[in-house]
């Protein structure tokens, strides 16, 4: 009955909020008045009112394993979706998703298979994490949402990042919702639900909740419309500004009811349609949809047999009648019309290992978009596996025609993204018009559709490449390169600038570097140009590095392409439009040729020769390490690229450490630098293993793209000691160090002998041109000349080893003049020549300052002065001939060397001293003192010479590092020294006057105390005897007044003790420890240090003139003459200048190509080896093994499950077979003792039962979702308990004749089995109403099945028990009918007295039976008698009314007495007496009925007759069912039972028996099969059984028949 105080909204009327006058519109007022005046149907729109939300903030979930927080808001059900999205993005700080997964399923709790749940959870989380998706759910902890919550909980406990899971739930069904009321509050929310409440708690694994309120309480539906609109609105948003794709939406269905099928249909009918993924095996709706998807053909057509099976499944699953099931079936078929949009995930099926692949594949296949759009989606999700398997299915080949048609918006996007190109074309045309005055012919427009489509595909691939680079998707860049993107065609100047100006991807410090280089504050939207990048590269590379972006030809091109104010721009850059030829003489010929070749209108002009070079530098400057490493592997000059990246990263790390940036940035950059340095070293090692000579060429060939440098120079610039210390580099340096000399032992001694005794030069060994591991430009020329002059000798000069004849041949082939020239040009000879000269200079300098100095310099002093002046000229030459272009940069680079600074100080000091020395006294004395100080610097300079020695070189570096350490120590020492010095001076000398001596006195004594001089006599002034005594008013022995004592003088010794403890013990030992650390640090890398210093030394002497100072002035004069006279020759040579005469090799294009190929092969082989090494590493093996073990364990679990199921099944079969044998034996024995049954009938019945059992088995096997089709049955058979399984009968709910049925009590066991135990004892009832009057040839038996909807799937139970403690426990379900026999029940022609006189007493054992039927096997089917399913059906001992001559007999006896009223009313057992009879006698059946039963029978008789009449009209006349046995007396028997017992038979059987008339014999056989015992005995119901009756065995009539 409806509660009058409760409103339709679900709340009590007194809980309603009165409407606010101000907030209520006039329309609502009128409506509210109308509601008051006249009643109308309640609706949300009319009877609810919106208010500003009063519930939003943060939830803190309690009651779980750990505390979670979630944002929440309560909104109206009709809130606009754009407002909600604005809230989510702005207030909740959520990033727009790249994918939206909407999960739908059952709201009621259900169990998922553990393995399926694990796969579902992992796949869902992986899909969300890898793509940056949002997950929409119902938000409450029931049904599918709880399974999603479990997956989220597992994920959040294992990783930091939480998946964005948004629960959209109705406000009215949320438990404890009153706790959430409050604006911008933090509320504690209890997740423990109240078992008595119909409301649900929110799931604590979600991150956000949107609670839709439509004014109702305890009702779902408020969120449905809001959720759909919000999903649609989000799907219209763009993934990001670069990708034109909207946010893709996919529906995920797990389990669910009929409403889920409707949701699927809505998704599929949306415009555009939304793909749906169905999780097969989760139950109910998802299983039905997946079944239909599997067997349905295109267009929603399904086979007729499968159609019937599907309808049966729908009826059984959802408890639907035929009309409802047909309606739902129609919806499913409508869904199947768009079968291509539905993806079914089946666990363990081929090709679908994970549900996340099913979700992402469904989006690509389901949405009918072009290949470029699919590529954009895969790129947005960062799922290269999806792109490779779904989009690039044709590999590098072109896709088929028609699959590429890009939508119009993508073309528009393409145009928008290339604004510079339009400018470029205009600029190019203008530039060319000025220069050449020609107009380029228009290219004909392409009309071939295939070519247009392929061009669009190429454009789409290039756009995807740009997006992949911007978004830092390394795998996608690799995939696109593998699938046909031409990087040389792709990379243009505008695109490269766009990459440098992107704000996406990892954070970088490029803007800070540009600001430092430009030395000005840049606006936030400053557009970085490539010229800016060139300046940054030069700044970071340092030294003489010159970037291509800052060279004149590139700047001219750049301004022609993009500069609207071209002449002004060129002028600002220090350039002019047309340079005169005279100025061009100073330019390199190569540069001039490049400028002549520039065709501004050529599309290839804005592209790059080596695109991977430019992209790798971009990746390094943008701090994209993975991308940089990938781009390094591609393209040419890998070794040079690695060294450039190493240097750039190191310089960026240095800049970061000096600025206010976080230390982590500097550390990361330093690590990246080490990574690239290691790559360069490994590549050098790989090359050296393959071919030593080519590896040396790699080190020395000119890198035209890297400032015409070499790999060795780049390694030195990057201070890559390991690279320089590599065997290959050292072999090269050794060859260079020795020049043309061939000396294996004691080279220094031989060279000194050659210098001091020039004739010995002729006895030294020399190498020919072909023995060199390197070729400089000058030696290249000399070698060519020698090839012309000495072809015979060069033919032999292939190796260093040979016999003596070849050696003599080689030596004779080198002229004496060449030997002398090569000897003095060798760096080792120059080194010793300079060293001897320097030592001579030092000796003379010592002599000059040690002897008396005259007014005019002596000869020795003039030699010293000339040496230093010539040395100063040499330093000037070094500066002028260094690589940098500008003089300021030359000086800056020169000063970066510490020894150059020492030379500068020493020369400058000496010059000042020399000028003062030439003056008169006292200035001459000052000059001499400056000489004396200056010689210190010249002695220090000797340390540089030690660098050539393997052992002394590292010590020089240690000294330099220790000096830096000591500077820090001096600062600390100064603090301690000052603290003691000032205190001591102030205490001991209180009356000092101001003077500079005070400053000296502060430091004087404390400083020397550090070294152990403690001035013992002055520690305590008055303790020593030497000091005079002091005191106030005291006199000495001579009577003189003693001086007063200094106050506080006693403090001095105490302060001194503390000072010495800190200074001498602590600080000095600290300094020693620091020095020790530095020593071991350098000692560990001493070999690399020495080799690195050796490079510097060799390069220094390689470039120096032959003669040492002061004779070097001759070399300078020679150089000037050669430069003035040799310009024409240099033009013929090419672009070689003096500064290029270093360790550099110039190769032809063909040689360069071969060298690049060799280098690329080495890179590939190196990475192949690393990959093999990684795969064979223990970590990788452990990982692979663990994966395999995990897979094996999962399979073993499956096998164990199957094995357990098979064992259970086999045990069941064994039990049933054993019972079958026993029951068969009992039946045979009983039937043999029962009169009236022919043996032939028995055999026929048994054979019939076995044949039909097979058909039933097949039907049961075809049942859908019959994973566990067994139920447990209990029989108490003479005190024995037998357990076996039965799948006998399936009943259909509500289709039989309505009769009073048995009532049951359901016992829920922990296992899947269901036991049904009868609550009350049942009465066998013969339904013989007036409407079904007996006919001469038949009888009618109508029985019904269960009535309750919950028990609609259950077959009836018939219990026959002796136990007295069984009682009726459920009075509501107990319905009994007292059987009665009317006059109409008696067959025509038979006397009523015959019935009463026929008595039969039957003795039987007590049988208690509990029958249950599998829930999953219920089918709605019409069974006919000849097709009756009899799969091991178990019925209790039945006795039916028997008649002779097809006449029904029955007897009623009202004279039975009960021992008590309780026995009369609550007797719960059948108690029968059996009297043995013979065929020759006939007895009457006394019908015993209690008064209560009679009254109950009279009350319900009329209704039953009406029901029977209603059924009889629809059923044709058939022979009345009876089991007949003829006896001699012609008497008939009737089974009569207690009236308070009702026997229910399945309505199926009632229908089948009514449907087709059969002869009596066949029906009897079927009933015998079904466990109905035929008896010719009179049954009399008595109130108890005696012990004697229990002993009766062979007279028993109870039989139970099984197949």
Swiss-Prot record:
One Pfam match: TRPM2
Glycosylation-annotated residues: 1076
Bilayer topology: Multi-pass membrane protein
Bias kind Basic residues: ranges: 427-438
Known catalytic reactions: Ca(2+)(in) = Ca(2+)(out); Mg(2+)(in) = Mg(2+)(out); Mn(2+)(in) = Mn(2+)(out); Ni(2+)(in) = Ni(2+)(out)
GO cellular component, one term: endoplasmic reticulum
Subcellular location: Cell membrane; Endoplasmic reticulum membrane; Cell projection, Axon
Residue intervals passing through the bilayer: 831-851, 898-918, 929-949, 962-982, 1055-1075, 1106-1126
Extracellular-side positions: 852-897, 950-961, 1076-1105
Keyword check for Endoplasmic reticulum: yes
Cytoplasmic topology ranges: 1-830, 919-928, 983-1054, 1127-1603
Lineage top rank: taxon: Eukaryota
Molecular function GO labels: calcium channel activity; monoatomic cation transmembrane transporter activity
Activity regulation (UniProt): Inhibited by extracellular zinc ions. Inhibited by intracellular Mg(2+). Activated by the neuroactive steroid pregnenolone sulfate. Negatively regulated by activation of GRM6 receptors in the ON-bipolar cells.
Tissue-level expression: Expressed in the retina where it localizes to the outer plexiform layer. Specifically, it is expressed in retinal bipolar cells (BPCs) of the ON subtype. Highly expressed in benign melanocytic nevi and diffusely expressed in various in situ melanomas, but not detected in melanoma metastases. Also expressed in melanocytes and pigmented metastatic melanoma cell lines. In melanocytes expression appears to be regulated at the level of transcription and mRNA processing.
Single Gene Ontology BP annotation: visual perception
Record field: compositional bias (Basic and acidic residues): 778-787, 798-808, 1352-1376
Listed InterPro entries: Ion_trans_dom, TRPM, TRPM_SLOG, TRPM_tetra, TRPM_tetra_sf
Gene3D superfamilies assigned: TRPM, tetramerisation domain
Coiled coil: 1182-1240
Keyword terms: Cell membrane, Cell projection, Coiled coil, Congenital stationary night blindness, Disease variant, Endoplasmic reticulum, Glycoprotein, Ion channel, Ion transport, Ligand-gated ion channel, Membrane, Receptor, Sensory transduction, Transmembrane, Transmembrane helix, Transport, Vision
Family: Belongs to the transient receptor (TC 1.A.4) family. LTrpC subfamily. TRPM1 sub-subfamily.
The protein's role, per its UniProt record: Constitutively open nonselective divalent cation-conducting channels which mediate the influx of Ca(2+), Mg(2+), Mn(2+), Ba(2+), and Ni(2+) into the cytoplasm, leading to membrane depolarization. Impermeable to zinc ions. In addition, forms heteromultimeric ion channels with TRPM3 which are permeable for calcium and zinc ions. Plays an essential role for the depolarizing photoresponse of retinal ON bipolar cells.
Disorder: Night blindness, congenital stationary, 1C: A non-progressive retinal disorder characterized by impaired night vision, often associated with nystagmus and myopia.
Protein name: Transient receptor potential cation channel subfamily M member 1
Species: Homo sapiens
Lineage: Eukaryota, Metazoa, Chordata, Craniata, Vertebrata
């Amino acid at each position: 009955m409806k509660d009058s105080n409760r409103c339709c909204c679900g709340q009590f009327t007194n809980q309603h909020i009165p409407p606010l006058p101000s907030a209520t519109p006039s329309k609502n007022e009128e409506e509210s008045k109308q509601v008051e005046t006249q009643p109308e149907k309640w609706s949300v729109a009319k009877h609810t009112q919106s208010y500003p939300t009063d519930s939003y903030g943060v939830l803190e979930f309690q009651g779980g394993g750990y505390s979670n927080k979630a944002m929440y808001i309560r909104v109206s059900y009709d809130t606009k979706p754009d407002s909600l999205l604005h809230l989510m993005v702005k207030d909740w700080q959520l990033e727009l998703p790249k994918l939206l997964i909407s999960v739908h399923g059952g709201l009621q709790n259900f169990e998922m298979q553990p393995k399926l749940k694990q796969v579902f959870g992992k796949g869902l989380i992986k899909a969300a994490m890898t793509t940056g998706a949002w997950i929409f759910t119902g938000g409450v902890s029931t049904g599918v949402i709880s399974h999603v919550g479990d997956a989220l909980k597992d994920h959040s406990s294992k990783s930091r990042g939480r998946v964005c899971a948004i629960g959209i739930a109705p406000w009215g069904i949320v438990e404890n919702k009153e706790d959430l009321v409050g604006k911008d509050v933090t509320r504690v929310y209890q997740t423990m639900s109240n078992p008595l409440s119909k409301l649900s708690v929110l799931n604590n694994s979600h991150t956000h909740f949107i609670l839709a309120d439509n004014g109702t309480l305890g009702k779902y539906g408020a969120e449905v419309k809001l959720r759909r609109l919000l999903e649609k609105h989000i799907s219209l948003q763009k993934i990001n500004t670069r990708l034109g794709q909207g946010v893709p939406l996919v529906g995920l269905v797990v389990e669910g009811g009929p409403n889920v099928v409707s949701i699927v249909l809505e998704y599929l009918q949306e415009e555009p349609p939304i793909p749906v993924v169905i999780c097969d095996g989760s139950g109910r709706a998802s299983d039905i949809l997946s079944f239909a998807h599997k067997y349905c053909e295109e267009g929603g057509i399904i086979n007729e047999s499968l159609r019937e099976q599907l309808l049966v499944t729908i009826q059984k699953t959802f408890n639907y009648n035929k009309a409802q099931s047909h309606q739902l079936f129609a919806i499913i078929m409508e869904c199947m019309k768009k079968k291509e949009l539905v993806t079914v995930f089946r666990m363990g099926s081929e090709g679908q290992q994970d549900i996340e692949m099913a979700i992402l594949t469904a989006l690509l296949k389901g949405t009918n978009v072009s290949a470029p759009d699919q590529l954009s989606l895969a790129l947005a999700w960062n799922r290269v596996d999806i792109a490779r398997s779904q989009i690039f299915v044709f590999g590098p080949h072109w896709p088929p025609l028609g699959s590429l048609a890009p939508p119009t918006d993508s073309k528009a996007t393409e145009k928008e993204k290339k604004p510079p190109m339009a400018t470029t074309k205009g600029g190019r045309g203008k530039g060319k018009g000025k220069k050449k005055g020609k107009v380029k012919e228009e290219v004909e427009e392409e009309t071939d559709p295939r070519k247009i489509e392929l061009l669009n595909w190429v454009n789409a691939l290039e756009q995807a490449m740009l997006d992949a680079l911007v978004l830092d998707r390394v795998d996608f860049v690799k995939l696109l390169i593998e699938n046909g993107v031409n990087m040389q065609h792709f990379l243009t100047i505008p695109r490269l600038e766009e990459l440098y100006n992107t704000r996406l991807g990892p954070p970088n410090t490029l803007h800070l570097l540009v600001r430092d280089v430009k030395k000005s504050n840049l606006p936030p939207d400053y557009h970085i140009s490539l010229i800016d990048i060139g300046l940054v590269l030069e700044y970071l590379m340092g030294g003489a590095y010159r970037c291509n972006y800052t060279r004149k030809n590139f700047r001219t091109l750049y301004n022609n392409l993009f500069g609207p104010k071209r002449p002004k721009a060129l002028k600002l850059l220090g350039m002019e439009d047309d340079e005169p030829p005279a100025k061009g003489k100073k330019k390199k010929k190569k540069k001039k040729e490049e400028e002549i070749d520039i065709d501004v209108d050529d599309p290839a002009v804005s592209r790059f020769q080596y695109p991977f070079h430019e992209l790798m530098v971009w990746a390094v400057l943008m701090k994209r390490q993975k991308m940089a490493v990938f781009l390094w592997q591609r393209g040419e000059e890998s070794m040079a690229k690695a060294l450039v990246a190493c240097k750039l990263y190191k310089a960026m790390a240095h800049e970061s450490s000096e600025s206010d940036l976080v230390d982590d940035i500097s550390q990361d950059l330093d690590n990246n630098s080490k990574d690239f340095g290691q790559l360069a070293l490994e590549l050098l090692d790989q090359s050296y293993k393959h071919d030593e000579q080519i590896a040396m060429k790699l080190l020395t060939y000119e890198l035209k793209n890297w400032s015409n440098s070499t790999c060795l120079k780049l390694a030195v610039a990057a201070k890559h000691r390991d690279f320089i210390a590599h065997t290959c580099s050292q072999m090269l340096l050794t060859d260079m160090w020795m020049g043309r000399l061939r000396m294996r032992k004691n080279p220094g001694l031989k060279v000194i002998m050659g210098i001091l005794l020039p004739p010995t030069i002729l006895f030294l060994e020399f190498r020919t041109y072909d023995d060199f591991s390197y070729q400089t430009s000058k030696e290249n020329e000399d070698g060519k000349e020698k090839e012309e002059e000495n072809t015979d000798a060069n033919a032999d000069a292939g190796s260093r080893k040979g016999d003596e004849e070849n050696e003599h041949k080689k030596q004779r082939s080198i002229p004496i003049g060449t030997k002398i020239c090569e000897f003095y040009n060798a760096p080792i000879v120059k080194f010793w020549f300079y060293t001897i000269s320097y030592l001579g200079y030092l000796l003379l300098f010592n002599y000059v300052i040690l002897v008396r100095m005259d007014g005019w310099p002596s000869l020795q002093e003039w030699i010293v002065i000339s040496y230093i002046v010539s040395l100063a000229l040499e330093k000037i030459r070094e500066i002028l001939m260094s690589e940098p272009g500008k003089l300021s940069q030359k000086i800056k680079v020169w000063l970066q060397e510490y020894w150059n600074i020492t030379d500068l100080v020493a020369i400058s000091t000496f010059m000042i001293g020399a000028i003062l020395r030439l003056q008169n006294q006292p200035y001459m004395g000052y000059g001499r003192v400056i000489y004396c100080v200056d010689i210190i610097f010249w002695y220090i300079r000797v340390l540089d010479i030690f660098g050539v020695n393997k052992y002394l070189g590292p010590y020089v570096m240690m000294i330099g590092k220790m000096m830096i350490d000591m500077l820090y120590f001096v600062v600390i020492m100064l603090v301690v020294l000052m603290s003691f010095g000032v205190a001591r001076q102030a205490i001991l000398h209180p009356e000092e006057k101001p003077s500079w001596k005070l400053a000296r006195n502060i430091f004087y004594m404390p400083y020397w105390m550090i070294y152990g001089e403690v001035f013992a006599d002055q520690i305590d002034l008055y303790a020593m005897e030497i000091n005079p005594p002091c005191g106030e008013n005291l006199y000495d022995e001579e009577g003189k007044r003693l001086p007063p004592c200094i106050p506080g003088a006693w403090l001095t010794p105490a302060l001194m003790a503390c000072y010495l403890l800190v200074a001498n013990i602590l600080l000095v030992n600290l300094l020693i420890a620091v020095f020790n650390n530095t020593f071991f640090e350098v000692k560990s890398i001493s070999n690399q240090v020495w080799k690195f210093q050796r490079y510097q030394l060799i390069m220094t002497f390689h470039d120096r003139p032959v003669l040492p100072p002061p004779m070097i002035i001759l070399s300078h004069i020679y150089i000037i003459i050669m430069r003035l006279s040799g310009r024409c020759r240099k033009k013929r040579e090419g672009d070689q200048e003096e500064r290029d005469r270093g360790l550099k090799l110039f190769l032809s294009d063909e040689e360069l190509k071969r060298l690049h190929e060799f280098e690329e092969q080495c890179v590939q082989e190196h990475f192949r080896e690393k990959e093999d090494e990684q795969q064979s590493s223990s970590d990788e093996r452990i990982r692979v093994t663990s994966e395999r073990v995990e897979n094996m364990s999962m399979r073993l679990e499956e096998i164990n499950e199957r094995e357990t199921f098979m064992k259970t099944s086999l045990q069941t079969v064994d039990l049933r077979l054993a019972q079958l044998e026993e029951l068969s034996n009992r039946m045979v024995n009983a039937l043999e003792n029962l009169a009236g049954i022919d043996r032939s009938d028995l055999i026929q019945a048994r054979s019939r039962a076995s044949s039909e059992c097979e058909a039933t088995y097949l039907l049961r096997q075809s049942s859908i979702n019959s994973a566990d089709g067994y139920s447990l049955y209990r029989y108490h058979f003479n005190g024995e308990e037998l357990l076996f399984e039965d799948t006998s009968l399936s009943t259909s709910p509500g289709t039989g004749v309505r009769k009073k049925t048995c009532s049951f009590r359901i016992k829920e066991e922990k296992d899947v089995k269901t036991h049904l135990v009868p609550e009350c004892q049942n009465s066998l009832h013969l339904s013989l109403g007036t409407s079904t009057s007996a006919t001469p040839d038949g009888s009618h038996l109508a029985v019904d099945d269960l009535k309750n909807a919950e028990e609609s799937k259950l077959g009836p139970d018939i219990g026959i028990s002796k136990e007295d403690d069984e009682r009726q426990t459920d009075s509501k379900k107990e319905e009994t009918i007292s059987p009665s026999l009317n006059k109409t029940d008696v067959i025509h022609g038979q006397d009523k007295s015959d019935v009463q006189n026929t008595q039969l007493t039957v003795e039987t054992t007590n049988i208690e039976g509990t029958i249950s039927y599998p829930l999953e096997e219920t089918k709605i089917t019409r069974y006919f008698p000849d097709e009756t399913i009899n799969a091991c059906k178990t019925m209790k001992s039945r006795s039916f009314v028997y008649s002779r001559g097809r006449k029904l007999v029955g007897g009623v006896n009202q004279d039975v007495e009960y021992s008590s009223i309780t026995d009369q009313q609550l007797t719960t057992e059948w108690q029968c007496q059996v009297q043995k009879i013979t065929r020759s006698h006939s007895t009457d059946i006394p019908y015993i009925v209690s008064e209560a039963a009679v009254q109950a029978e009279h009350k319900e008789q009329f209704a039953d007759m009406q029901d029977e009449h209603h059924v009889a009209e629809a059923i044709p006349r058939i022979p009345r069912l009876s089991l007949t046995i003829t006896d001699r007396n012609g008497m008939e028997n009737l089974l009569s039972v207690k009236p308070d017992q009702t026997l229910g038979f399945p309505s199926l059987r009632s229908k089948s028996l009514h449907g087709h008339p059969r002869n009596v014999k066949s029906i009897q056989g079927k009933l015998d099969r079904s466990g109905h015992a035929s008896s010719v005995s009179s049954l009399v119901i008595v109130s108890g059984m005696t012990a004697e009756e229990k002993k009766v065995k062979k007279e028993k009539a109870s039989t139970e028949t099984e197949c």
